[in-house]
């Protein structure tokens, strides 16, 4: 009886592993039709009695301003080009910060955020964290860094029901993602930790200070030169 149960569990895990590899491999080339986070936001709005229309327009990476690419890397994951999905130093710093009390600090890389937004529900359970790690490893193994950045910029939330760079550029600045200035991009990147509470187009003093810091980091990263070398170190 026990052996039969174990065999079924192993078989289910193997099917899940194979299926998830296939899905991630397909999404290496095919734009995701939607994300788990979009579904979650839509369902939440139904339960709240105020259904929302999701705003999202997929844009190829070369149609998105380099300013925005650098801004989100500067603000969210400065070791993006170097790591394989996990920033160990940031994780250790977040653990120490959280142990001291106060606000909870995250340490998710862009790759982890893509995994969470695409495939998973909100929460901090061990199961969800384990699945996030699994999908992050698959994405890092099967996608290029440019593809990870492209999917991130097209799936991240920038206001209530506003997903992706093009929708965000239109919503906040009445422009296209390709035309975002360094200042506009820095404000969009500055609100990413809490995009439903902070506004890129009507920034608080904190968001303005954070945007200024992000612009400094953008210059230090090297701008276009950084992007040109993004994939040169590794990938097949």
Curated annotation (Swiss-Prot):
Subcellular location(s) of the protein: Cell inner membrane
Family under the similarity heading: Belongs to the glycosyltransferase 51 family.
GO biological process, alphabetically ordered: cell wall organization; peptidoglycan biosynthetic process; regulation of cell shape
Transmembrane parts of this sequence: 12-31
Domain of life: Bacteria
Example of a GO MF term: peptidoglycan glycosyltransferase activity
SUPFAM superfamilies tied to this protein: Lysozyme-like (SSF53955)
HAMAP family: PGT_MtgA
Pathway in which this enzyme or protein is active: Cell wall biogenesis; peptidoglycan biosynthesis
Enzyme Commission (EC) number: 2.4.99.28
Principal location: membrane
GO CC, alphabetical: peptidoglycan-based cell wall; plasma membrane
Membrane association type: Single-pass membrane protein
Gene3D superfamilies: Biosynthetic peptidoglycan transglycosylase-like
Catalytic reaction list: [GlcNAc-(1->4)-Mur2Ac(oyl-L-Ala-gamma-D-Glu-L-Lys-D-Ala-D-Ala)](n)-di-trans,octa-cis-undecaprenyl diphosphate + beta-D-GlcNAc-(1->4)-Mur2Ac(oyl-L-Ala-gamma-D-Glu-L-Lys-D-Ala-D-Ala)-di-trans,octa-cis-undecaprenyl diphosphate = [GlcNAc-(1->4)-Mur2Ac(oyl-L-Ala-gamma-D-Glu-L-Lys-D-Ala-D-Ala)](n+1)-di-trans,octa-cis-undecaprenyl diphosphate + di-trans,octa-cis-undecaprenyl diphosphate + H(+)
Organism: Pseudomonas syringae pv. syringae (strain B728a)
Record keywords: Cell inner membrane, Cell membrane, Cell shape, Cell wall biogenesis/degradation, Glycosyltransferase, Membrane, Peptidoglycan synthesis, Transferase, Transmembrane, Transmembrane helix
Protein name: Biosynthetic peptidoglycan transglycosylase
Annotated PANTHER family: BIOSYNTHETIC PEPTIDOGLYCAN TRANSGLYCOSYLASE, MONOFUNCTIONAL BIOSYNTHETIC PEPTIDOGLYCAN TRANSGLYCOSYLASE
Function: Peptidoglycan polymerase that catalyzes glycan chain elongation from lipid-linked precursors.
């Amino acid at each position: 009886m026990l052996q039969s149960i174990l065999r079924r569990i192993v078989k289910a895990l193997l099917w899940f592993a194979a299926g998830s590899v296939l899905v991630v491999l397909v999404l290496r080339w095919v734009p995701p039709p939607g994300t788990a986070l979009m579904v979650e936001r839509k369902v939440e709005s139904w339960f709240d009695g105020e259904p929302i229309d999701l705003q999202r327009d997929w844009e190829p990476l070369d149609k998105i301003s380099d300013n925005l690419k650098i801004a989100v890397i500067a603000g969210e994951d400065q070791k993006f080009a170097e790591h394989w999905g996990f920033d160990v130093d940031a994780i250790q710093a977040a653990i120490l910060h959280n142990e001291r009390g106060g606000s909870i600090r995250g340490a998710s890389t862009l790759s982890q955020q893509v995994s969470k937004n695409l495939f998973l529900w909100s929460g901090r359970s061990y199961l969800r964290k384990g699945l996030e790690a699994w999908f992050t490893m698959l994405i890092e193994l099967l996608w290029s860094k440019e593809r990870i950045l492209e999917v991130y910029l097209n799936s991240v939330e920038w206001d209530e029901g506003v997903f992706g760079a093009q929708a965000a550029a239109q919503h906040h600045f009445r422009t296209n993602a390709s035309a975002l200035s360094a200042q506009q991009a820095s404000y969009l990147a500055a609100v990413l930790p809490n995009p439903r509470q902070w506004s890129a187009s009507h920034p608080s003093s904190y968001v303005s200070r954070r945007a200024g810091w992000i612009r400094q980091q953008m210059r230090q990263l090297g701008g276009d030169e950084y992007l040109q070398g993004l994939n040169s170190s590794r990938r097949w």
